[in-house]
Design a protein with these regions (language model features):
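Initiator methionine at the very start of the polypeptide chain
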Residues: 1, 14, 26-28
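Intrinsic-disorder-associated, low-complexity terminal segments enriched in Asp/Asn/His/Tyr and depleted
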Residues: 3, 12, 18-20
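Iron-sulfur (Fe-S) cluster-binding modules
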Residues: 6
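Short Gly/Ser/Thr- and charged-rich N-terminal loops/segments
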Residues: 9
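A short Gly-Trp-Pro
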Residues: 18, 23-146
Length: 146
């Protein structure tokens, strides 16, 4: 993430303006307030609100913040929890951290540390018995047929 701090000088004051940009596939774009709330401040988008919750095209889900590949569409499944669910990450793409509540396990992009969601095990949704519960707002999607 590129963080740019601009200083503008008025009559008797200096004003600071912070601008956040994300590099997605080589394109720089401004991070929205909602994206900052979830990706940087470790928030959660409302259930059933994300664009990838009921999205099942073939391709790769990438980190919205840095563009690193995170999940393949073959690992996505319908869990009914309200967020995109994956039973396997791309090897080395995800880092697991103990959540502040001491119960859940947070998942972040291993490349840039962007908050993705949480991982749960032992629920029996798939044979792999793992559910990565991910905020859609933390993801972008690259279709296989580009």
């Amino acid at each position: 993430m590129l963080y740019l701090r601009l200083f503008t000088q008025g009559r008797n004051q200096v004003q600071t303006v912070n601008i956040y940009f994300l590099d997605i596939g080589g394109l720089m774009r401004k991070l929205t307030e909602e994206e900052k709330r979830v990706i940087i401040n470790r928030g959660t988008e409302p259930p059933f609100s994300g664009k990838y919750n009921d999205f099942f095209k073939n391709g790769t889900y990438i980190c919205k913040q840095c563009g690193a590949p995170l999940f393949r569409s073959e690992s996505k499944f319908k869990s009914g929890c309200g967020w995109p669910s994956f039973d396997e990450e791309i090897k080395g793409a995800i880092k697991r951290l103990k959540d502040e509540d001491g119960i859940r396990t947070e998942i972040v992009c291993s490349n840039c540390g962007a908050h993705l969601g949480h991982v749960f095990e032992g629920e029996g949704f798939t044979l792999k018995n793992t559910r990565h519960c991910v905020n859609s707002i933390s993801l972008d999607f690259i279709p296989d047929n580009r």
